[in-house]
Amino acid sequence: VPVVLSTVETKSFSGNLWPQIQALFPGHAPIERSSMNSWDDPNFVAAVEKAGRKKIVLAGLWTETCVALATVQMLHDGYEVFVVEDCCGDVTQLAHDNAMKRVVQAGAKPVTALSVMLEWQRDWAAKGTYPAVMDIVKAHCGAYGMGVEYAATMLHGAPPTQLPGYTIPHAGGAGGHAGGRAAAAKA
């Protein structure tokens, strides 16, 4: 999937792209722009056009400006835009919600990060991407990730997933269950 990264006035306004995002795309420099609307920037438009896709998956900070303005213009220019609602943010929840209403009324399709990832996965038999998808699900998808982890460890006997930066404490006490630790802590 082609990716276009963009930042706005990093030296005077917004700062650099978050390192957690940049780390996913090493050697992929963000397009620096001055306009809040990325679609006003000829370099951004050229990068999107070079990708040759008419379906755009868009996410970003400041839903009511950076995301909404670009979305409305892309729709006007014939693109089909999917706004990843849970990967956008704004100064208030109300501002975010109103911006999402605006882009949906203009014709954008609201999606979530999980729905995009699973649509791209499409088939659990696609083993080339399955392990990475499951790692993302377990690390970032709440109850779904917990269910996947439970099924893997309790039903299929897999070892617990070790996430970077986390350790799984040894469960001592009553048969290794948390209840044993709680009882010991009360004693």
Task: Give residue ranges: language-model regions.
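Short beta-strand segments at enzyme active-site cores
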Residues: P2-V8
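Active-site-adjacent betaalpha module
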Residues: K11-A187
